[in-house]
Amino acid sequence: MQIAMVGLGRMGANMVRRLIKAGHECVVYDVSAENVAALEKEGAIGAGSMAEMIGKLEAPRAVWLMLPAAITGKIAREVAGHLQPGDTIIDLSLI
């Protein structure tokens, strides 16, 4: 399965590692380019923007959010603006 992860803090990064270990293809995005680069070294596909991340996914797309509460709504709306019917947002942000 191909899945995107937005938010590569401790929880998001560890989830990406588990998904990769289980054989999933992960496309990752974070405001910290360092966090993206670290996971690229572990097998993830990095993206420098939300649009680039979505563009690297095949339909139907699945985007997982692992974000702090303060920005969850804003980022969820931004992601939704790039998606089509049939795509999925998985929100496990801290609220």
Model-identified regions with their sequence ranges:
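NAD(P)+-binding Rossmann beta1-loop-alpha1 motif at the extreme N-terminus of oxidoreductases
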Residues: M1-A62, H82-T88, L92-S93
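Beta-loop-alpha module in the N-terminal Rossmann-like domain of NAD(P)-dependent dehydrogenases
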Residues: M66-V79, S93-I95
